[in-house]
Amino acid sequence: MLISFEGIDGAGKSTQVMKLKRYLQERGREVLALREPGGTPVAEEIRELLLERRNDITPVGELLLFAASRAELVQQVIQPALENDSDVILDRFFDSTTAYQGYGRGLDLDMLAEINRIASCRLVPDVTFYLDLTPEDALMRKFSEKSLPLAFESEELDRMENSGLDFYRRVREGYHKIGGENPNRIIIIDALLSPSEIHRKIISSIDALCTKTA
């Protein structure tokens, strides 16, 4: 089973990825949790390039770096894990590219769709959980976690996090459009709910999916 989590930075994806991993492992399943970009030595180096605040990267360059990282992760890690009947949980997948580089940066959506297909080797998650949060709430959450004064730009944030509120508003709007186009795959969850409430909604959907595919 291939499961992905989506949402703007600060929505709580990483927390829910680990909660779901533990839940599935407790039920005797082999589970691999991965993040994008990253997950292989090359992909982790690409991650550093993408997030370093001092790097001035063009939108197309950013797109292709994300795609290169994904291609490495899919072919070296995800596909072998799925072939061994492991569950794979992803903290971001190709929907992030559509939302961030497409709606956020304004790149052509048809071009992105083709690059996504190539980089992902046409893999599509069985289910995607989109944790919905406004950029304002996400920013407040991030600075609260770091015990820092609220600011729209900060050296405490990485290059992507420092893209600004208008950028993240476009990204969020993009996620909603993607969700509307893929209602059978994408489940939208209010990220302002407590972590335990979000987890309950997620495992309810996962249990239903496992029953359906058993």
Swiss-Prot record:
One family name in Pfam for this protein: Thymidylate_kin
Binding site for ATP: G7, I8, D9, G10, A11, G12, K13, S14
Function field: Phosphorylation of dTMP to form dTDP in both de novo and salvage pathways of dTTP synthesis.
Major enzyme class: transferase
Family: Belongs to the thymidylate kinase family.
EC number: 2.7.4.9
UniProt cross-references to CDD domains, sorted A to Z: TMPK
Ranges annotated as spanning the membrane: none
UniProtKB keywords: ATP-binding, Kinase, Nucleotide biosynthesis, Nucleotide-binding, Transferase
A Gene Ontology BP annotation from the UniProt entry: dTDP biosynthetic process
Reactions listed under catalytic activity: dTMP + ATP = dTDP + ADP
GO MF entry, a single one: dTMP kinase activity
GO cellular component: cytosol
Domain of life: Bacteria
Name recorded for this polypeptide: Thymidylate kinase
Taxonomic path: Bacteria, Pseudomonadati, Chlorobiota, Chlorobiia, Chlorobiales
Keyword Ribonucleoprotein on entry: no
HAMAP family: Thymidylate_kinase
